[in-house]
Amino acid sequence: MTKRHSSNRAILILESPWELDYSDSNRTSVLPFVEGVGKLAGDTEVYHANFYDKSSFLKALDCLCKRKFTNTTVYIAAHGYKKKVGSVSISDLIWEVGLRSKECNITGLMIGSCFVGENTSTMEAYLEGTNLKWCAGYSSTSLWLEGTLIDCAILSRMTDLDETDYADKDNMIHHFASSIAAFSDSFKIGRDYRNQPVPLNKSLQFVIQPSGKGKRAKCVSEEVFEVRESLQL
């Protein structure tokens, strides 16, 4: 008998092995953390596949993009450096997700990788003309556990949005700010290329493309952290 799924939302995880230590035989994974997000939501499916290079990334993405949900978010989790995530260029990743975004109703892309957030111009360019409404990532290195928890907070909030929520820029900014409100903006999330410490509010970058004719993709990181500050006591 064919299994029927009643969930309306989905988080698709594409993860590359972390090898955080010499004995890490694919032990470390974001999967159990994101599964917790799905269980908390109650109506969110979580699907996972590993990738190792561009070819396996494409196969993994096609494997996960089998069904259209009312709201689907892609979470790419892998080591990052300069313009690459794993061994795949950031532009290729966003391009391929964007190609499938309309058919699969993919609205957001969370990239849990070091240094990808320094490429906000690439994010802006490759979001144009797609169904993607947002993309986020870190412009420095990112502590693994702390970064994963922040990613999950963002995924939890943004996956819960409805189509109308993406029409207003300020509304999207407020949802991002609310998702990270519990995290200190001055927390040292990682380091830059010169090994200097970088606080969360200088590392975490947000690019949005609100729905509606004529609306362009734009980096709104400063606005997100300004609103986040207003949510503190």
Please state what every model-predicted region is:
Residues 1-73, 108, 112:
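A domain-level signal for caspase-like cysteine endopeptidase catalytic cores
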Residues 79-108:
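A short, glycine/acidic-enriched catalytic loop
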Residues 72-82, 134:
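Active-site microenvironments of hydrolase-like enzyme catalytic domains
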Residues 18-22, 52-56, 79-85, 115-119, ...:
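Short acidic, S/G/P-rich loop/turn micro-motifs used as interaction or catalytic elements
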Residues 77, 112, 138:
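Conserved residues at the C-terminal ends of beta-strands
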Residues 116-232:
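Active-site-proximal C-terminal subdomain of hydrolase catalytic domains
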Residues 34-45, 99-107, 128-138:
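Structural alpha-beta junctions
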Residues 60-64, 90-100, 120-125:
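Short, charged beta->alpha transition segments
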